[in-house]
C-alpha cells in the first residue's frame, strides 16, 4: 500500500488549502454558470481599474482538464513545504505564493501593454487570462534552481526532472490545452527566476501580512469601484485629492453580478 493521503495533507497544509480553494471555485463557476469574462484578467479590464481580477483570475479555471493539470503539478510542488531544513518550508511557500500571484499578474499586463503600445498588436487588448499556471510555473522555476535533483509528478503517472520542468510543462500544456497562454506561463517563469536569484526577496511574516493587507484593500475597493459587487455598506466619496478615498458604512448589501456569457479570446494560465 502507498502512503496514506492524510500524511501528505498534514505535511502540505498550504498546498492542500490552495488545491481545495481552486477546486471549490471551479465547482461554483460551473454550478452558477459564471462567465469567465466575469473573473478573468485582461488588459482592458486592468486599465479600467478591475485590479481584483488579478486574484480571481489566478484562482479560476476554464475546464476540468486545466484544473487537474494545475492542481496535480501544484500538489507535487508542495514538497517546498517539506524543505524547511534548506531554507524553504510552509512560511516561505506562503510568502512567495503571494509574490508570484501579484508580480506575475502585473508582469503579464506589462507585456500586453508593450505589445499593444509599441508593436500595435491589439489582439492582446481583449485577451482574458484565467488559471493558476503563473504560480505553478513560478514554483517549478524556484524548485528547479534551489532543488535541481527533485522530480515533478503529473497526474501520478508522468515524472519530469524539475530542472527542465518549466519548459517541458510549457510544451506539454500547449499540447493538452490549446488555449494555454504562453505569455502567462512565461511571466510565472520570469518571476520565479527573479525570486530564485534574489532579485525579489526579503519576504518575512511582517512584509507578507503587509502585502496581504494591501491586496485585501485594493481588492475590495476596486471591486466596489468596478460595480462587480454591491458593497452598499461602503461608499467612496470624492475629495479634493481623488486618490484619497473616504469610507462610510451606510448599509449592508450583497449582490453578485455574474454573467454566463463567455468572452472570446480566453487564454488559460
Swiss-Prot record:
Disulfide bonds: none annotated. The chain crosses the membrane at residues 9-29, 60-80, 97-117, 127-147, 157-177, 182-202, 203-223. One of its GO terms (molecular function) is serine-type endopeptidase activity. It is an enzyme of class 3 (hydrolase). Gene3D superfamilies: Rhomboid-like (1.20.1540.10). One of its GO terms (biological process) is proteolysis. Its EC number is 3.4.21.-. The keyword Repressor does not apply. Belongs to the peptidase S54 family. This is RHOMBOID-like protein 13. It comes from Arabidopsis thaliana (Mouse-ear cress).
Amino acid at each position: 500500500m502507498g502512503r496514506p493521503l492524510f500524511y501528505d495533507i498534514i505535511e502540505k497544509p498550504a498546498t492542500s488549502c490552495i488545491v481545495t480553494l481552486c477546486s471549490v471555485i471551479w465547482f461554483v463557476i460551473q454550478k452558477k454558470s459564471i462567465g469567465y469574462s466575469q473573473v478573468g484578467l485582461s488588459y482592458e479590464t486592468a486599465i479600467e481599474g478591475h485590479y481584483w481580477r488579478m486574484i480571481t483570475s489566478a484562482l479560476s479555471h476554464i475546464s476540468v482538464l486545466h484544473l487537474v493539470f494545475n492542481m496535480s503539478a501544484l500538489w507535487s510542488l508542495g514538497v517546498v513545504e517539506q524543505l524547511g531544513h534548506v531554507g524553504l518550508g510552509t512560511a516561505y511557500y506562503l510568502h512567495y505564493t503571494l509574490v508570484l500571484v501579484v508580480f506575475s499578474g502585473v508582469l503579464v499586463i506589462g507585456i500586453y501593454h508593450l505589445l499593444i503600445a509599441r508593436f500595435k498588436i491589439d489582439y492582446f487588448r481583449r485577451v482574458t487570462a484565467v488559471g493558476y499556471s503563473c504560480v505553478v510555473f513560478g514554483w517549478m522555476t524556484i524548485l528547479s534552481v534551489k532543488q535541481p535533483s527533485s522530480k515533478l509528478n503529473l497526474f501520478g503517472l508522468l515524472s519530469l526532472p524539475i530542472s527542465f520542468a518549466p519548459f517541458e510543462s510549457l510544451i506539454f500544456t500547449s499540447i493538452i490545452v490549446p488555449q494555454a497562454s504562453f505569455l502567462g506561463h512565461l511571466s510565472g517563469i520570469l518571476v520565479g527566476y527573479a525570486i530564485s536569484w534574489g532579485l525579489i526577496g526579503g519576504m518575512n511574516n511582517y512584509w507578507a501580512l503587509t502585502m496581504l493587507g494591501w491586496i485585501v484593500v485594493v481588492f475590495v475597493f476596486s471591486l466596489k469601484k468596478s460595480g462587480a459587487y454591491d458593497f452598499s455598506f461602503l461608499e467612496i466619496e470624492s475629495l479634493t485629492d481623488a486618490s484619497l478615498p473616504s469610507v462610510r458604512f451606510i448599509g449592508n448589501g450583497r449582490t453578485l453580478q455574474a454573467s454566463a456569457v463567455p468572452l472570446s479570446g480566453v487564454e488559460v494560465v
